[in-house]
Amino acid sequence: MSNIKEAEEQTGISRANIRYYEKMGLLQPKRNEKNGYREYRPEDIKRILQIKILRKLDVPIDEIRDTIDHPEMFGNVIQKQKERLERQRAELTDVIDFCMEIKVENFEDFDPQYYLKKMDEKEKKKVQQEGSCDS
């Protein structure tokens, strides 16, 4: 059994985050009957480390809770997160590409109408391409 300080040291997760995970229903350590302190068993430490990995993968807390409540959903949760990250990557690639199209050096020369029009055109083209892929 570990106290919260030891759990923090073993996992690299702050006490505040460990308490937050408890509050969100992701973790339920036993309480010492004599002093009321939390006592973390090896399976609690493992759970904290599992949560740590899923949070590093940017999996939302509610989906982590679903995975804990229904372990058989884990594969679906990971697949859903992968798809979400792939969409974000595509969006970021579009934004980076658009940044490279901006040719002005001076903010005063930056024409918002021109670039908003280009953005709208790109968005329409992307929607059309996605529509033709769905057909």
Predicted segments, located by residue:
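Short, charged amphipathic alpha-helical surface segments
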Residues: K52, I64-K125
